[in-house]
């Protein structure tokens, strides 16, 4: 998941916890740890490939790091280059034809029985945040390769009804250049040519960094990386949930209904800097007090939009209802100047992260919040500047793809567990994924995998071995029933 879109995922998932519990009432006692028993002997479950080898590969990839003592693998770093070679080897082992494009994405493709048909893309990202867990992104890559290898050893790979291409995207987290989806964005064709001019903290531009890695790229060649929409049938991504819902309801897998849209704001409040002991309270123009009031207003607005959101023709009843179940707002950074205990600040800056599945509702919240921020500034005789730093629309997953993924997950879990009385849960994603970028190219579907405690972007991130198995088996079932 993108670090730029990762804050407060817990709260968004929690909004859907009640729904999941109601839709799967007896799930809490199921799948708490699937008993393997005789499953080891089932040839159709491929435990050696889909579990043992897949888990071993995840741990092997988790050791490919630029840092000593923790996992860090950023865009085209030395560790990333080693990961590229490793992933290519695994793809070739699965019978796939491989190549690396000019943005560092690793591709593995099989044409199947009809090379001219629209291709299914399956992927996730191979980069990580700093001090990362080893399942974020990597699970989606490894599970796809494992499923195709199972088909390869079973003689079914060339019988696929359409081409299938696994893509390990080079950069989703945006750690080095502070811009997300460099890998998937190139494939989707949503990166402007000016992307190559973006610099890191050392003032090294992306195009120069690529040249350092023996990749010559121009604005023209960047645009040529875009896939022809007519050549692509759809995109599927398997990813850890990065939240607690699946663990709470006792299901290893869940289908993603959609990905929340996100807006990031930077608010700067300027007042009158002064001595903390000599300026009377009644005479202060304190930007910290103004910022504090604004943050409380934000919390009230986002906790209870039905009570605090003004309608003003910007927000319908249905939009407010949607916001009440999906809206989350976070102030993640705050700084003061000069930041001294005995000085009234002259300036306060803070960030606002707003996410919701309803784009109109999110825009209504931004409109109302901005209006109230300026009103508070006027009341307190301070000045305010609101900057829009990032905006991404919500993505609704394709209903047909989601239905197929749900059937595949159900089939996999039934094979592993036996009779299942409840439906596979459906969840929203509060975090951003490569599927958001690829949605500009084709229809998308996502499958979530349970992770312990909902923890992600942390060394404590963990997925049970049998849940890796379930994810790979569900991917295999999806591929075997591909239309």
Curated annotation (Swiss-Prot):
Gene3D superfamilies: 3.30.70.360, Zn peptidases (3.40.630.10). One of its GO terms (cellular component) is endoplasmic reticulum. Expressed in stems and leaves, and at low levels in roots. Not detected in nodules. GO terms for biological process: purine nucleobase metabolic process. Residues 1-30 form the signal peptide. One of its GO terms (molecular function) is allantoate deiminase activity. Pfam families: M20_dimer, Peptidase_M20. Mn(2+) 2 binds at residues 136, 173, 457. It catalyses: allantoate + H2O + 2 H(+) = (S)-2-ureidoglycine + NH4(+) + CO2. The keyword Plastid does not apply. Binds 2 manganese ions per subunit. Involved in the catabolism of purine nucleotides. Can use allantoate as substrate. The sequential activity of AAH, UGLYAH and UAH allows a complete purine breakdown without the intermediate generation of urea. Homodimer. This is Allantoate deiminase 2. It comes from Glycine max. The lineage of its organism: Eukaryota, Viridiplantae, Streptophyta, Embryophyta, Tracheophyta. The gene is AAH2.
């Amino acid at each position: 998941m993108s670090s730029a879109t990762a804050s407060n995922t817990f709260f968004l998932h929690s909004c859907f916890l009640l729904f999941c519990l109601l839709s799967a009432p007896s799930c809490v006692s199921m799948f708490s740890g699937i008993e393997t028993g005789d499953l080891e002997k089932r040839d159709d479950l491929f435990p050696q490939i889909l579990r043992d080898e897949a888990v071993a590969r995840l741990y092997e990839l988790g050791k490919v790091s630029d840092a000593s003592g923790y996992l860090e693998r950023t865009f085209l770093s030395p560790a990333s280059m080693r990961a590229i070679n490793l992933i290519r080897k695994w793809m070739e082992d699965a019978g796939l034809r491989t190549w690396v494009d000019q943005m560092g994405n690793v591709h593995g493709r099989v044409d199947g029985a009809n090379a001219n048909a629209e291709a299914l893309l399956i992927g996730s990202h191979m980069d990580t945040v700093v001090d990362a867990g080893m399942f974020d992104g990597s699970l989606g890559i490894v599970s796809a390769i494992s499923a195709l290898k199972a088909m390869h050893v079973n003689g079914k790979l060339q019988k696929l009804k359409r081409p299938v291409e696994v893509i390990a995207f080079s950069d989703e987290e945006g750690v080095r250049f502070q811009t997300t989806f460099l890998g998937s964005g190139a494939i989707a064709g949503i990166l402007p040519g000016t992307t190559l001019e973006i610099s890191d903290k050392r003032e090294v531009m992306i195009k120069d960094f690529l040249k350092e890695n023996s990749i010559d790229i121009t604005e023209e060649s960047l645009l040529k990386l875009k896939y022809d929409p007519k050549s692509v049938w759809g995109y599927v991504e398997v990813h850890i949930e990065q939240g607690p819902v699946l663990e709470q309801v006792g299901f290893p897998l869940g289908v993603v209904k959609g990905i929340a849209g996100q807006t990031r704001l930077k608010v700067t409040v300027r007042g009158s800097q002064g001595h903390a002991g000599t300026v009377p309270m009644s005479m202060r123009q304190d930007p910290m007090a103004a910022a504090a009031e604004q943050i409380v207003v934000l919390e009230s607005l986002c906790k209870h939009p039905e009570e605090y959101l003004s309608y003003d023709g910007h927000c319908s009843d249905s939009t407010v209802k949607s916001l009440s179940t999906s809206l989350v707002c976070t102030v993640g950074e705050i700084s003061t100047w000069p930041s001294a205990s005995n000085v009234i600040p002259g300036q306060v800056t803070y960030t606002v992260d707003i996410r919701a599945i309803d784009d109109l509702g999110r825009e209504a919240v931004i409109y109302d919040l901005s209006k109230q921020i300026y009103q508070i500034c006027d009341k307190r005789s301070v000045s305010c500047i609101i900057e829009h730093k990032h905006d991404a629309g919500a993505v609704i997953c394709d209903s047909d793809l989601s239905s197929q993924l749900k059937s595949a997950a159900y089939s996999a879990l039934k094979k592993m567990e036996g009779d299942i009385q409840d439906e596979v849960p459906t969840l929203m994603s509060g975090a951003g994924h490569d599927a958001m970028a690829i949605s500009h190219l084709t229809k998308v579907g996502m499958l979530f995998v349970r992770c312990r405690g909902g923890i992600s972007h942390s060394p404590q991130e963990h997925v049970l071995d049998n849940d890796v198995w379930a994810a790979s088996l569900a991917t295999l079932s999806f591929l075997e029933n591909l239309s």
